[in-house]
Amino acid sequence: GLTVEGLSFCYGSHRVLDIPRLDLPRGRVTALVGPNGAGKSTLTRVLVGLERAKGTIRLDGRALRAKERTRLGYVVMQDVHRQLFGAEVREELALGVPPEELTDGRVERTLSDHGLADVADRHPMSLSGGQKQRLVIAAARMVDKEIYIFDEPSSGLDYRHLRSTARTIRDLAEADKVVVVVTHDEELLTACADRVVQMRPLAGPTASTTD
């Protein structure tokens, strides 16, 4: 799994993260919960190399640089508009997937599983907010990564599509991936989380030391 040790991250003089150790095992869904400002989204960005922090992050015992974590990780962001690049919904699912892995029916099955078959030929930016959310989650299922981060993945989803999202998240964990979910949604927690990590805001600025 993923092991975080001695992790510290600051915005200016304000320390946002101070984590002596955190274990994120393969094969289980770890939920990060806590109030706004607790550093949940910042931690996920550090985990996949989008932010640099002090400390060590290991995958299966091997220390990883930020660039390696970016290559091995996939993030479903809260702002899904920044993750849509294809000209059609169907094309979006195939982006970044090696041609040999695009077996017959795989894209169509994934579209159907996420209630997107009827909009397969539309431009992703023409979809509703909930449809865009489902598309980005479906795309996560298509790529083969080791670390999956879902930041508020149930935003804009009705109950039926929340259940299909929870199923996708569980499928990834059952494929022995590291899966982390940031959520305030109790229904999603109940549907997919194996472990819950409670995060709290740190008080005040970091101590300043002068040698």
Feature names for model-found ranges:
Residues 33-35:
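The feature captures the beta-strand-to-loop junction immediately N-terminal to the Walker
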Residues 52-71:
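Conserved ABC transporter NBD signature motif
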Residues 183-184:
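H-loop/switch region of ABC-family ATPase nucleotide-binding domains
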